[in-house]
């Protein structure tokens, strides 16, 4: 190469130019590059070499005209046959800088590869002063350029420079349109000679890299339009074999710098970006592959790959950079030239999940289609785009799009709270696998107000910032087809059930928990799960529930030394009977029966209530069977009709019954600390030959289930008396246990149809029993407080279940010692043994 430089220098001296060796060598390289039409920024082998030649000809002064340059090239070619054969410039005439010629793309690629240069390296080399470039230090300069290129990584071209040869066939504007659009150019290349002076004769130390890069970027619009004038259908055949080389070069440079580095490489520009940038900005489908994204400088080879690319975060980030580089460009401004073909936007596969949001829907625009993918003028500044910050067409959408949130408990509530202050929410949709949500407001103004607010104020979900913008892809959210008549109600959707967690396992009554929620409103129902240390409290209105949740978020709720976590239950909307109609009917029967029977004058109202309730109680054996199914299996139905009539109290969500085995067991377990609050003794009998009466079924309740039944009692008119008795039962568990004894006796009588009599008849039967001799196994001595009796009736279940008293205990010692030593247990056992003795006597008589 040194010999070539010397020969070139001799040739130039013979013409009288007096140029030194380095100037002649660089001038020859620039002329060769000009003849081969090597690209600078777009990667196309067609345009831009004239500018490169002028930049690389450092040996020539600014006054050197084009004819002088040709003379220098001619003398150099006569003294070097090798270079003449390589560059093929011996017979070429003067080439004006603004003219366009096709070059041999194969030779151009080989020359660049032999020098180790790329299009960017040529531009960088042009910035060096001529006195610092010599044949000796030229290799070191090129190595420095390569090293700097590797460190910096590839830059975004945005149609400016650095484009590789992997561009698709250029879709060019017709010449007549191109001539009309030339008013966008400030001057032709011939008239812009003075503007080249800062590039040709500048002090290297006084100019920054950005300013030089800015000067080079000024040529892009002209060169892009000039390049699009020449249509060549055989372009792919000439350049397809260069794909791997330039792509590998792109890989060496790195796939993309960080956002801060990208921003540092560009200055703000006026006007609009080139048409190719605008097309790729909108994500329009290319008409041919392979296609090179003019924004990301990345080749794609199929529709699927193109869709994946424009949906990626890198493309979205660089689209945002394009908007920052051209602040005056408004993609959504519907004045001037538009994107014509209304069907092109329908073909777009870009949902734009990144920072730009989804693309706008299809719309009809006027004007003939000029560009390859729409009506795109050459460099006009008013074009449509998916820029969500603009407000050109937002009036047609009322769907707020929320993105990049983190999932957690009560996610729906957190999302709806973002937009609820701005208006009524009509519908919403939360995606399962993607962290995106769509919330439809009642009016467009409400949706726009929410979006405008969160453009200046950060939107937080679980304390983390999220992105909120107006969805232009979705204008409405359709109602589910299966529920066309279902009216969406946000308040009903959220429910009014408060979830309390981290409660103590024991040592408190149900009323103590209810007092936590009483200050915020009326309590309709509740279920307490001591085994799980949690409780569900249903308030009368959602506002009451929200008031408690909001207050506890600001000030922690402490209960018996524990910080109780309070939130709105998303799983359960309300607390209802599993079979609501049957449960209400039974409760009505319970009320009517309680009023129809006249108790003895000596009996208290609690005794009367217990007896009337007990008349609906099923047989002990049947109660045992159903208790096992409820405690162990948690199933909704059992094998017999009587069990199906039992309206167990369970939690119910909006769509289905959401209760599992553990929850059902927890419901039963919670009754130990407050005694038999149900007053409906579901006795378990070891005997299986007791008869059943279907009409006398009753609701078996544990303490939490009894509390749940309050909701249904309140829904039935004229049963306030029973509610008051239940509330009294919550405050005094021992009293409830005592009141249950007569109920057990009545239930035992109800098991046998022959003994379906009044309380007076029951008393006479008890007197008649004493006239007969009772076997020893049915005898029981006087009550002793510390002597447990009937331990065999306590069996292990999910806890320890007393079949006589229908109570669960988690501790065996408490069940067999404390409970079996209690007076209610003793009385029930005594009456149960008397019943067995009476049955035996009747059998002997028959």
From Swiss-Prot:
SUPFAM superfamilies per UniProt: RNA-binding domain, RBD
Positions where Phosphotyrosine occurs in the chain: 158, 202, 219
Cross-link Glycyl lysine isopeptide (Lys-Gly) (interchain with G-Cter in SUMO2), sequence positions: 3, 132, 146, 245, 269, 478, 487, 491, 515, 522, 554-555, 616, 629, 718, 735, 769, 835
Name of this chain's protein: Matrin-3
Taxonomic placement: Eukaryota, Metazoa, Chordata, Craniata, Vertebrata
UniProt modified residues of type Phosphothreonine: 150, 678, 740
Source organism superkingdom: Eukaryota
Modified-residue entries (Phosphoserine), positions: 4, 9, 14, 22, 41, 118, 126, 157, 164, 188, 195, 206, 208, 211, 234, 264, 275, 509, 511, 533, 596, 598, 604, 606, 653, 670, 672-673, 688, 746, 758
Residue spans of biased composition, Acidic residues class: 652-664
GO biological process terms, semicolon-separated: activation of innate immune response; blastocyst formation; heart valve development; innate immune response; post-transcriptional regulation of gene expression; ventricular septum development
Organism (species): Mus musculus (Mouse)
GO molecular function terms noted in the UniProt entry: identical protein binding; miRNA binding; zinc ion binding
Comp. bias regions, Low complexity: 665-675
Location of region: Disordered: 147-174, 187-213, 342-394, 588-779
